[in-house]
């Protein structure tokens, strides 16, 4: 009997708490969410990464990597083939269909080493030295750059991963290629 009444007491307390919280839900102040644009005029923005200081690195799929500094200035850092206005151009990076400049992330120790990592489609390793079971070698690569202190340019491109196959043959199926 003692166990049963203890159980019933627990159920009663739980039910009361549930009832009280549901009736208070109607009178609670709920937060409102608002959206605001912090940067406009982009073409197919794909990814963003933020420094602790508030600078925003971002990629545009068919253009390249840029940074919007906390002061509001925008610096175009790494451009793709056929893009203009960037501090450096990389003719091996291309955009076609679903392929292009995609991910960006900052090194956990960015403040000290200034390293940024970028994923993009490249034809740099097409042909000679290409190791794949597919008939073509265009693929995605992961690059590392060092960002200048003034955030206006990058240097020391290092291709870290060179053989991420993105599409073995032409088709109408979307699996990461043209």
Show which residues each predicted segment covers.
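Bacterial N-terminal signal peptides that target proteins for export
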Residues: 1-11
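N-terminal signal peptide c-region/cleavage motif recognized by signal peptidases
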Residues: 20-22
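Acidic, Gly/Ser/Thr-rich repeat motifs that build Ca2+-stabilized beta-propeller blades
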Residues: 25-178
């Amino acid at each position: 009997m003692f166990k049963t009444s203890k159980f019933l007491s627990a159920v009663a307390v739980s039910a009361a708490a549930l009832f009280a919280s549901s009736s208070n839900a109607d009178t609670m102040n709920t937060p409102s969410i608002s959206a605001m644009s912090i940067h406009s005029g982009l073409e197919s923005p794909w990814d963003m990464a933020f420094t602790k200081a508030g600078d925003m690195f971002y990629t545009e799929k068919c253009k390249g990597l840029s940074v919007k500094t906390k002061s509001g200035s925008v610096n175009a850092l790494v451009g793709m083939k056929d893009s203009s206005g960037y501090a450096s151009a990389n003719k091996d990076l291309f955009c076609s269909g679903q392929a292009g400049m995609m991910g960006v992330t900052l090194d956990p120790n960015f403040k000290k080493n200034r390293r940024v990592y970028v994923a993009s489609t490249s034809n740099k390793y097409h042909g000679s030295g290409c190791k794949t079971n597919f008939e073509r070698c265009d693929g995605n690569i992961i690059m590392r750059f060092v960002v200048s202190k003034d955030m206006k340019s990058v240097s020391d491109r290092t291709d870290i991963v060179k053989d991420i196959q993105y599409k073995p043959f032409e088709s109408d199926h979307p699996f990461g290629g043209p």
